[in-house]
Design a protein with these regions (language model features):
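C-terminal motif of bacterial Sec signal peptides marking the signal peptidase cleavage site
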Residues: 18-21
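Active-site loop/oxyanion-hole signature of alpha/beta-hydrolase fold enzymes
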Residues: 107-148, 152
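Flexible "cap/lid" loop of the alpha/beta hydrolase fold
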Residues: 171-212
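Conserved HGGG/HGGXW glycine-rich cap/lid loop of the alpha/beta-hydrolase fold
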Residues: 59-115
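Catalytic active-site module of serine/aspartate enzymes centered on a nucleophile-bearing elbow/loop
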Residues: 310-350
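Alpha/beta-hydrolase
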Residues: 194, 201-279, 283
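Conserved hydrolase catalytic core segment
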Residues: 143-186
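Conserved loop-alpha-helix segment in the C-terminal half of the alpha/beta-hydrolase fold
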Residues: 275-317
Length: 350
């Protein structure tokens, strides 16, 4: 009897080891498939320079594919305007292990892409057409194409979706309101009043003189505003990818589109408003807001209800860069949304 029990126990152990080995093999196979090359010829690590046709000539933009999934491909649109893809590098710690492919992309005038140094090209409608050309070049379509726009990238993503939602599988609007006037009002009525009165007075004095290049302006903003509402860490502890990206900011592009002040929009985007147009969107949409953001989280929750198939992710501990200061909430929700849409859900419950 003891021999039979021992033999049965050995069978159970052997079976467990066999299943574990199968799971490891399956995991390795999935990982191998995710990172395998889909290109022929010379290998470039997933980098592709894409020619962009404009009224001013043809320029090249830089893209880099990370991973390989024929059904889930997320194109990342950086903020600024004028920053680079580099602050998205934290995505490498979360999306690959879930089998989600993502694509870095420096918009024209940013990072590794061409910089025409022509302010007439810093135009929202032109950038929408640029994204469409990138989509075509990368063979993205409604079967696999998710676009994630963060901050200014969210503006670009919304305008792209309004015109080209037929090409999208999913839309992610991260930390961006749908109305520039509403954002400016929130900055004036809420954000500025959270500053110490003497700090705000000095900032306003510099802005009144249009002395934005004065080092004192950033000395005031960094600890009192940026570390509270952009990324909630002491500035000296900000992640290297964020610092690297912001150090390469195209100031011409930023000021032309956003304006020089951090409290509202005064550039070309000053009157931009898509709140009503969101009602036209039926593509599954995730809106991400954060408690300490420069953007009004209540407004962003409303955005998720304006679209026909919207989900809202609230980052309780996050700010404008909530992919860093509330990472677990941000990426858990993002991954659940992308996978849910891939499984056929129109409105993903988070």
């Amino acid at each position: 009897m003891k021999k039979i029990k021992s033999f049965s126990l050995l069978l159970v152990i052997a079976g467990g080891l066999f299943l574990a080995a199968c799971n490891q093999t399956g995991s390795k196979k999935t990982q191998s498939s995710y990172f395998e090359s889909v290109d022929s010829g010379l290998q470039t690590g997933g980098i592709k320079m894409i020619p962009i046709k404009t009224a001013k000539g043809t320029f090249k933009v830089w893209t880099k594919r990370f991973g390989n999934n024929p059904k889930m491909k997320v194109l990342l649109l950086n903020g600024g305007p004028g920053a680079t893809h580099e602050y998205f590098e934290c995505f490498e710690n979360f999306l690959p292990k879930e089998g989600i492919e993502f694509i870095y992309y420096d918009q024209l005038g940013c990072g590794n892409s061409d910089n025409p140094q022509d302010t007439t090209m810093w135009d929202l409608a032109r950038y929408v057409e640029e994204v469409e050309q990138v989509r075509v070049a990368l063979n993205l379509n409604a079967d696999n194409f998710y676009v994630l726009g963060h901050s200014w990238g969210g503006i670009l993503a919304m305008d792209y979706a309004v015109k080209y939602q037929k090409n999208l599988k999913g839309l992610i609007i991260s930390n961006m309101m749908a109305s520039a006037p509403d954002y400016s009002k929130y900055a004036a009525d809420v954000l500025s009043k959270q500053l110490k009165p003497d700090v705000l007075a000095e900032i306003r004095a510099l802005e009144a003189k249009k002395d934005f290049a004065n080092p004192r302006y950033m000395e005031l903003l960094m600890p009192n505003f940026y570390a509270e509402h952009i990324l909630r860490l002491p500035v000296e502890n900000w992640p290297e990818p964020v610092n690297r990206s912001f150090a390469k900011m195209n100031q011409s592009l930023y000021v032309t589109m956003q304006g020089p002040s951090e409290f509202g929009l005064s550039g070309k985007l000053e009157k931009w408003d898509r709140m009503e147009d969101l009602k036209k969107l039926s593509v599954p949409t995730l809106v991400i807001g954060a408690k300490h953001d420069t953007m009004d989280p209540a407004h962003m929750e409303k955005m998720s209800k304006q679209v026909k198939n919207g989900s809202y992710l609230f980052c309780e501990n996050g700010s404008h860069m909530s992919m860093y200061d509330d990472q677990q909430t941000y990426f858990t929700g993002l991954i659940k949304f992308v996978k849910g849409v891939n499984e056929g859900q129109k409105k993903v419950k988070l």
